């Protein structure tokens, strides 16, 4: 049998192409799944684990157990693993055991899980959200451990298909509600841990299960404990307020009226109070006689109904008057009326307390207005590109102040987070060349400006207007003052707030370039009408006072303000080179000036700004929206961080739209100083790679810069390939390695593992 030349060539080609994949032992599907798991866990320090490729079975990756070529077990308990889990867990072909317990994994439990799983242990982590309903599809599941997390909501009613489940641990979460009825279908269940939750209702659902261990401590269960549960060998119920009084005993048997001879004993009868004969005998059990009646007992009697017939009630045989037992149609017993009085008193007190609480709440709301409606959450900034347009000549006439509607989120005072791929205007380079040199603005702005129609008033930072809860040190730069501008003067400087002078726009407000006489420039932020409506004059002045205290070399300086005719504006120093985002992604001429040393100095300047906010200010000031568009560059490429102290004015935005800067915990409403550190790490990644933090034009898996870069930071070959090509290799390898290490520590998924900002500043200073 002979082969033609092309057949031999084809066979060798196929062999060469398949050799890299056939060399490994592990199923390629499992390799891809564990690579994705490694990435979502934040690239932890696990022996042999890789983000791409590898042979988990052949190389015996840490915690991995295989059967032939398939991964069947992954056990990494107590390895200090962070990050989160994703739906790619379902890609494992035949995995049976996943033990990720006692780590720092956060986020929600993924909806997609491998159908072959038998033992799933996620206990002692930081999972949040609800228990996913898709667990009902795991018919082979025998052990499920979700204890010691932050899971909330009710336990879903989906246990019908989990007939093989023998252990269920839901302890130490924030679960509430009743036990689902399908939990009674768990015929194989032996161990059930529900302690330390907020579960309510009764335990009747599980009374027929053959349990050996049951722990319901520290819950809110009520009702009697079913007798079958009391027979469980290991039954713990301390701290749960079981209330056996809500279940009434069996009703007493109906007793026929005794014969007449039994009514004759000499028992003192209680005459009717109103002279009406007692109600006829009703088939109720008589009251038991009191053995030791107290002297002169009070007589509690209910007024009999006028339609009561004749007959004698049963009385106590002890000679002491007792309460008459009336039929349901009567007026009720004395005990009944006593209970009503108690209920009436308690209800009255409760109503008084509720009304008082409502009054206090309304009073406090009137004081604070709606300030607390705003919190700084995640938000997506889609802002125009910042570019320096040629100065416009002021118009000879003055028009009314423009009232722009609220627009897309604002970023920096120029150069916001625009839609990626936004073209740089052709005249941008010409405009930049037309800008004044570094000394574009002198510090004599605090003196009255000649164009002002009214003499400027000095606003001292120790004002007494609206002393709100400020997040700034009260004594910092207490002598600072700001120039009070008039609307007329700012109209003149900004060409009547013309669109040509807009250098940024967003939800806080539009930013205009203001040209003063003698070629000086300012940046004027005109707060949106939405902010003006929700902020009083006193609150605005307090904001100005607080921002004035944030005066350091790397914080964008507030120079003045305007508060006239319902309009509020903040006047900042002007940075002619725009933002770092412009320099990296839009301005090619400026990009060429970003040498390695310049980039390290920019990272150091940004870090020092955050160090001032986090560690000098008491209490600390969290920026909450730190990104490359907030890092402005002056004429010497020195850093000025914008929007410091304005976080509370930002409306809530979905964290999924934060363009790759948001730390994982921000998704759940937690924003701390360490969240700023994570955002700084992303900015340093931009400096290292020249890539955008999020780019939809790239392949899936490469779109989010942090997710793509983290696994490569400790691989020297991959690290050199990811450096910005415009540097042309002009950087020391030792400096590159140190910078990558700083970035890697800043991008830890767990906030507690990220270094304090002072440590980052110190490490960057050692690189200079």
UniProtKB/Swiss-Prot annotation:
Keyword annotations of the record: ATP-binding, Cell junction, Cell membrane, Disulfide bond, Glycoprotein, Leucine-rich repeat, Membrane, Nucleotide-binding, Receptor, Repeat, Signal, Transmembrane, Transmembrane helix
Function comment: Regulates the expression of transcription factors that define the cell fates. Acts in a non-cell-autonomous fashion, functions in a radial inside-out signaling process, and mediates cell morphogenesis and cell fate across clonally distinct cell layers in floral primordia, developing ovules, and root meristems. Seems to be required for the regulation of cell shape and the orientation of the mitotic division plane.
Phenotype upon changing residue 222 to L: In sub-12; no phenotypic effect
Cellular component aspect of the GO annotation: plasma membrane; plasmodesma
Regulation: Regulated at the post-transcriptional level.
InterPro entries xrefs: Kinase-like_dom_sf, Leu-rich_rpt, LRR_dom_sf, PRK1-6/SRF4-like, Prot_kinase_dom
Extracellular side: 25-341
Organism: Arabidopsis thaliana
Glycosylation sites: 70, 119, 243
Superkingdom of this protein's organism: Eukaryota
Compartments (UniProt record): Cell membrane; Cell junction, Plasmodesma
Signal peptide: 1-24
Domains: entry comment: The protein kinase domain is catalytically inactive, but nevertheless important for SUB function.
Protein name as it appears in the record: Protein STRUBBELIG
Effect after changing residue 357 to S: In sub-16; no phenotypic effect
Cytoplasmic side: 363-768
Quaternary organization: Interacts (via intra-cellular domain) with AN; this interaction is not required for correct subcellular localization and recycling of SUB. Binds to QKY and POQ at the plasma membrane. Binds to QKY at plasmodesmata (PD) in root epidermal cells to promote tissue morphogenesis.
All copies of domain Protein kinase, residue ranges: 497-768
């Amino acid at each position: 049998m002979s082969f033609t030349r092309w057949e031999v060539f084809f066979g060798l080609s196929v062999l060469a192409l398949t050799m890299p994949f056939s060399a490994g032992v592990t199923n390629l599907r499992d390799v891809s799944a564990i690579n994705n798991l490694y990435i979502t866990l934040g690239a932890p320090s696990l022996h042999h684990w890789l983000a791409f490729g590898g042979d988990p079975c052949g190389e015996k990756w840490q915690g991995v157990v295989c059967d032939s070529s398939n991964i069947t077990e992954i056990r990494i308990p107590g390895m200090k693993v962070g990050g989160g889990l994703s739906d790619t867990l379902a890609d494992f072909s035949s995995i049976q055991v996943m033990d990720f317990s006692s780590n720092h994994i956060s986020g929600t439990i993924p909806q997609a899980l491998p159908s072959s799983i038998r033992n799933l242990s996620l206990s002692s982590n930081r999972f949040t959200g609800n228990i996913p309903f898709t667990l009902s599809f795991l018919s082979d599941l025998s052990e499920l451990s979700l204890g010691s997390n932050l899971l909330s909501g009710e336990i879903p009613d989906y246990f019908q298909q989990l007939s093989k489940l023998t252990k269920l641990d839901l302890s130490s979460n924030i679960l509430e509600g009743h036990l689902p009825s399908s939990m009674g279908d768990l015929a194989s269940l032996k161990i059930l841990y529900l302690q330390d939750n907020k579960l309510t209702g009764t335990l009747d659902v599980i009374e027929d299960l053959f349990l050996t261990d049951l722990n319901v401590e520290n819950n809110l269960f009520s009702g009697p404990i079913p007798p079958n549960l009391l027979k469980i060998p290991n039954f713990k119920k301390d701290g749960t307020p079981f209330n056996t009084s809500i279940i009434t005993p069996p009703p007493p048997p109906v007793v026929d009226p005794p014969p007449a001879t039994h009514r004759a004993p000499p028992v003192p009868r209680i005459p009717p109070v109103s002279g009406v004969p007692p109600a006829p005998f009703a088939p109720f059990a008589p009251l038991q006689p009191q053995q030791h009646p107290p002297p002169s007992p009070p007589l509690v009697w209910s007024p009999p109904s006028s339609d009561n017939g004749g007959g004698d009630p049963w009385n106590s045989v002890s000679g002491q008057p007792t309460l008459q037992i009336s039929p349901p149609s009567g007026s009720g017993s004395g005990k009944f009326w006593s209970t009503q009085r108690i209920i009436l008193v308690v209800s009255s007190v409760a109503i008084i307390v509720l009304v008082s609480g409502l009054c206090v709440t309304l009073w406090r709301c009137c004081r604070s207005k709606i300030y607390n409606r705003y919190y700084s959450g995640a938000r997506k900034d889609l802002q125009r590109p910042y570019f320096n347009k040629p100065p416009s000549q002021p118009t000879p006439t003055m028009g009314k102040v423009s009232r722009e509607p609220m627009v897309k989120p604002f970023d920096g005072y120029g150069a916001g987070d625009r839609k990626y791929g936004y073209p740089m205007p052709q005249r941008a380079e010409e405009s930049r060349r037309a800008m004044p040199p570094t000394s574009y603005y002198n510090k004599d702005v605090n003196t009255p400006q000649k164009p002002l129609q009214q003499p400027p008033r000095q606003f001292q930072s120790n004002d007494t207007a609206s002393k709100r809860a400020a997040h700034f040190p009260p004594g910092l730069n207490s002598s600072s003052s700001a120039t009070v501008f008039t609307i007329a003067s700012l109209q003149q400087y900004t060409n009547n707030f013309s669109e040509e002078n807009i250098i940024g726009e967003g939800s806080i407000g539009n930013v205009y370039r203001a040209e003063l006489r003698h070629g000086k420039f300012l940046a004027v932020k005109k707060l949106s009408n939405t902010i003006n409506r929700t902020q009083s004059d006193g609150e605005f002045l307090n904001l100005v006072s607080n921002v004035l205290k944030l005066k350091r070399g790397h914080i964008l300086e507030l120079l003045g303000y305007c508060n006239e005719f319902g309009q509020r504006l903040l006047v900042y120093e002007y940075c002619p080179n725009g933002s770092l985002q412009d320099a990296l992604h839009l301005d090619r001429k400026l990009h060429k000036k970003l040498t390695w040393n310049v980039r390290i100095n920019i990272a150091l300047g940004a870090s020092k700004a955050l160090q001032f906010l986090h560690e000098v200010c008491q209490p600390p000031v969290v920026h909450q929206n730190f990104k490359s568009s907030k890092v402005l560059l002056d004429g010497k490429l020195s850093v000025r961080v914008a929007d410091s102290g304005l976080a509370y004015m930002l409306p809530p935005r979905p964290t999924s739209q934060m363009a790759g800067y948001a730390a994982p915990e921000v998704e759940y409403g937690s924003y701390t100083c360490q969240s700023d550190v994570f955002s700084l790490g992303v900015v340093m990644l931009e400096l290292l790679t020249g890539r955008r933090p999020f780019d939809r034009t790239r392949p899936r898996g490469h779109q989010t810069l942090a997710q793509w870069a983290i696994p490569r930071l400790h691989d020297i070959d991959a690290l050199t390939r990811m450096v910005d090509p415009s540097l042309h290799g002009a950087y020391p390898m030792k400096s590159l390695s140190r910078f990558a290490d700083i970035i890697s520590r800043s991008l830890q998924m767990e906030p507690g593992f990220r270094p304090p900002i002072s440590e980052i500043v110190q490490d960057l200073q050692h690189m200079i």
